[in-house]
């Protein structure tokens, strides 16, 4: 059995823009992480302020830190991703899930619904499988992770199978048509309490490269003679960019979500660019969303947010919750 995850740091001890339940508030405790996860030691350095850190421009260092954090806080003992795939910052991913938990708690008398009765759809699960891993460990939710990339799905499947207790909680499915998001993916009898998505950020490969160069410049690592590794800043094409970028992808998701209004209680998506919010609100109005929530998030100097929407009114959502309580959990064959 995986070890018991360690509790989050008390907000009183470490003021932080991260969610109060986030286990990564404050600075990483590198001495403690190294004691329990010695492989991380090779990548720990002193930053210009004399504090322990890693070189966040080094893909292997970022992977080593993620492995240690996932093992330390979530009991994930085996985790890896193929070269060139997105290596996400754990704290920000956890914040999205905690924000979604708060959204559900607001409709459950202030109590977060936990356990396998609650189902979540992850659009673009990626090779890292990060949202299902954290969401299941924190709240016991079950996940369906979807992706258009067979290599990413194979990586996510390997992570699930390598860690005891995950196979019954995390299922994976390929979206065979990149032109669609929900259509052709969801079966008519499936229902999800939440959907989540970290959409492609850029509109083209060239824009993605410019974004990577900008991040390297901010880290003081930009060298025009070096080829930029994409690992910790982006990944494969579908992870990095799509025609029209984030705004177009989210608009397409909103339009298509209306066709599945009765199968997902709350849809959601990250929106990294503040400038994309007005277009998302307009798309939601056109689609006929009954309620829209914009939840701000922050990690360090980075400001972000997610937007959540539902096509169900209060009475329909109340009926949804009652049906979930009455309906026994049903297992289906693995995808």
From Swiss-Prot:
EC number: 2.1.1.181
SUPFAM superfamilies membership: S-adenosyl-L-methionine-dependent methyltransferases
GO cellular component terms, semicolon-separated: cytoplasm
Keyword annotations of the record: Cytoplasm, Methyltransferase, rRNA processing, S-adenosyl-L-methionine, Transferase
Annotated stretches, region: Disordered: 1-23
Compositional bias ranges of the Pro residues kind: 1-10
GO biological process, one term: rRNA base methylation
Superkingdom, taxonomy of origin: Bacteria
GO molecular function terms attached to this record: 23S rRNA (adenine(1618)-N(6))-methyltransferase activity
Cellular localization per UniProt: Cytoplasm
Catalytic activity entry: adenosine(1618) in 23S rRNA + S-adenosyl-L-methionine = N(6)-methyladenosine(1618) in 23S rRNA + S-adenosyl-L-homocysteine + H(+)
InterPro entries registered for this protein in UniProt: METTL16/RlmF, rRNA_lsu_MeTfrase_F, SAM-dependent_MTases_sf
NCBIfam families: PRK11727.1 (NF008725)
PANTHER family named among the record's database cross-references: RNA N6-ADENOSINE-METHYLTRANSFERASE METTL16, SAM-DEPENDENT METHYLTRANSFERASE
Role description: Specifically methylates the adenine in position 1618 of 23S rRNA.
Protein family (similarity comment): Belongs to the methyltransferase superfamily. METTL16/RlmF family.
HAMAP family: 23SrRNA_methyltr_F
Name recorded for this polypeptide: Ribosomal RNA large subunit methyltransferase F
Organism: Azotobacter vinelandii (strain DJ / ATCC BAA-1303)
Gene for this chain: rlmF
């Amino acid at each position: 059995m995986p070890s018991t995850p360690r509790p989050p740091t008390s907000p009183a001890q470490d003021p932080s823009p991260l969610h109060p339940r986030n286990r990564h508030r404050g600075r990483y405790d590198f001495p403690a992480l190294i004691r329990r996860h010695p492989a991380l030691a090779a990548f720990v350095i002193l930053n210009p302020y004399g504090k322990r850190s890693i070189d966040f421009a080094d893909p292997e260092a970022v992977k080593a830190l993620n492995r240690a954090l996932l093992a330390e806080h979530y009991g994930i003992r085996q985790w890896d991703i193929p070269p060139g795939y997105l290596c996400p910052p754990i704290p920000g991913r956890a914040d999205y899930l905690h924000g979604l938990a708060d959204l559900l708690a607001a409709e459950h008398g202030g109590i977060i619904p936990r356990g396998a009765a609650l189902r979540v759809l992850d659009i673009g699960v990626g090779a890292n499988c990060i949202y299902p891993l954290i969401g299941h460990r924190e709240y016991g939710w079950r996940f369906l992770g979807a992706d258009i990339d067979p290599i990413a799905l194979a990586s996510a499947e390997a992570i699930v199978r390598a860690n005891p207790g995950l196979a019954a909680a995390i299922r994976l499915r390929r979206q065979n048509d990149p032109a669609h998001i929900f259509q052709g993916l969801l079966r008519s009898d499936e229902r999800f309490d939440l959907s989540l998505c970290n959409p492609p950020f850029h509109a083209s490969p060239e824009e993605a490269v410019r974004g990577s160069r900008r991040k390297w410049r901010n880290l003081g690592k930009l060298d025009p003679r070096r080829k930029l590794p994409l690992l910790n800043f982006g990944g494969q094409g579908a992870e990095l960019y799509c025609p029209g970028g984030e705004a177009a992808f989210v608009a397409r998701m909103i339009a298509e979500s209306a066709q599945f209004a009765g199968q997902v209680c709350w849809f959601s998506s990250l929106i990294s660019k503040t400038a994309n919010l007005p277009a998302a609100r307009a798309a939601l109005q056109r689609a006929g969303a009954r309620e829209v929530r914009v939840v701000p998030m922050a990690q360090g100097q980075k400001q972000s947010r997610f937007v959540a929407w539902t096509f169900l009114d209060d009475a329909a959502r109340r009926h949804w919750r009652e049906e979930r309580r009455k309906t026994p959990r049903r297992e289906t064959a693995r995808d």
